[in-house]
Amino acid sequence: MGGETVKSWTAARQSGSVRGMAESGVNPTAAALLGLLHEGPMTGGQLMAAAERRLAPYWSMTRSQVYRELPVLADKGLVRLGKPGPRMSQPYAITAAGKRTFSRWLAEDPGRDTIRNPIALRIAFGQLHSASQLKSLQAAANEYHTEALARVREQAKNARKEGDTYDASALEFAVAYHKAALSWLKSAPVSS
């Protein structure tokens, strides 16, 4: 499948079909939910917790995104609703059509990374900050990335222990990201 995937990405790029909504008809958030539902039926809250546990180090999702996507996936027949549980919580299960759609999504070109770093954006306008603002910004970012790095290192270690090489690899991306951010912060100017 690997060679076929690369060929399909190249063909899609050459034809100009890689933009906006994927050919599978699902966006990355919907695809992430379908992927998580391969683990078994889950309520919206359980999906949010699973996304936080498994994906948050490298892919963010908000509660509103999760709850907005679930009815859309149900309307498309990609998930089915289970019986309501306590406090009207409703489990969702992936359907055969959902599994096929997810497989198509996996084979598509993932597109380009979207880089949106709020610290880099503020540093870009560093000449408009006071020196104390820049130092405070850098200190807060250092603290965040140091704590996040420790967390994702532990998650990657646990994934390797459990034999989940794919999850461990994705978590290593987050480890590398936080290391790079900390390295960059050391060289970022802190006075205007």
Question: Locations of the language-model features?
Answer:
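Amphipathic alpha-helical dimerization/coiled-coil segments
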Residues: 103-150
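Hydrophobic alpha-helical segments that form the core
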Residues: 169-181
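Amphipathic, well-ordered alpha-helical segments in soluble domains
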Residues: 43, 47, 69, 144, ...
